[in-house]
């Protein structure tokens, strides 16, 4: 009878040993999940700062505390079509230039009230603007706001 228990325990232990390596959730693996977007860790950090400006930390947790940027990237990677993904990525890459033009410095160095102003101005860009970069920033901010909220 003890032989059966030993074999059963050995089978469970072996199964667990086989499964454990596949349960690795390091940051590098998370970035690989966004293969359609080609997002770098610095762009992911910028997206987190933008989401945190939309939902700032107060008595409740802010967007950065909840890792909303990962949710946004998964939704964009999995739910939007290729053109929308390209528009989102282009807007994310152009956002710091827009922030420098509007607020004077990179977005991460701005005060929270100025960050809010930059986002508001980005969302207020006319849909029929001739500048493709501004149009990309507007679409990026609208998508980010929608998935953040």
Please report, for each region that a protein language model flagged, where it lies by residue.
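Long, well-ordered alpha/beta core segments of mature domains
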Residues: 37, 53-68
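N-terminal export signals
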Residues: 5-24, 111
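Charge-dense, low-complexity intrinsically disordered segments
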Residues: 37, 41, 62, 82, ...
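Mature-region segments of soluble proteins
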Residues: 45, 49, 53, 67-149
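C-terminal segment of N-terminal export signals and the immediately downstream linker at the start
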Residues: 1, 5, 20-53
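Short alpha-helical hairpin
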Residues: 23-28, 63-70
